[in-house]
UniProtKB/Swiss-Prot annotation:
Protein name, UniProt field: Small ribosomal subunit protein bS20
Record-annotated membrane-spanning stretches: none
Gene: rpsT
Gene3D superfamilies, alphabetized: Ribosomal protein S20
Region feature Disordered, mapped onto this chain: 1-28, 69-88
Biased composition (Basic and acidic residues): 1-23
Length: 88
């Protein structure tokens, strides 16, 4: 339990930030999973559209500091590699 008003506020802020970070990470994972499932199913046109959305989600998470920029870049690279291999 926080002992001071500032500690109470810090606890509230930390909770809000944690929830926002969890939501954003969940969105990233969901968008990546969606693309992978579409690629595995063979629907490449839908997968390409979903990949654009996934890249945007990754960029936003990196911009907000939720993901490290290089982590986002690596995930985008692997996603596009999988998509391009399926297109061949």
């Amino acid at each position: 339990m926080p002992n001071t008003k500032s500690a109470e506020k810090a606890l509230r802020v930390a909770d809000a930030n944690r929830q926002e970070n969890r939501r954003a990470k969940s969105q990233v994972k969901t968008s990546l999973t969606k693309v992978k499932k579409l690629v595995d199913a063979g629907s490449l046109t839908e997968a390409e559209a979903a990949a654009v959305s996934a890249q945007s989600t990754l960029d936003k998470a990196a911009e907000k500091g939720i993901l490290h920029p290089k982590n986002a870049a690596r995930r985008k690279s692997r996603l596009m590699k999988k998509l391009n291999q399926a297109a061949k």
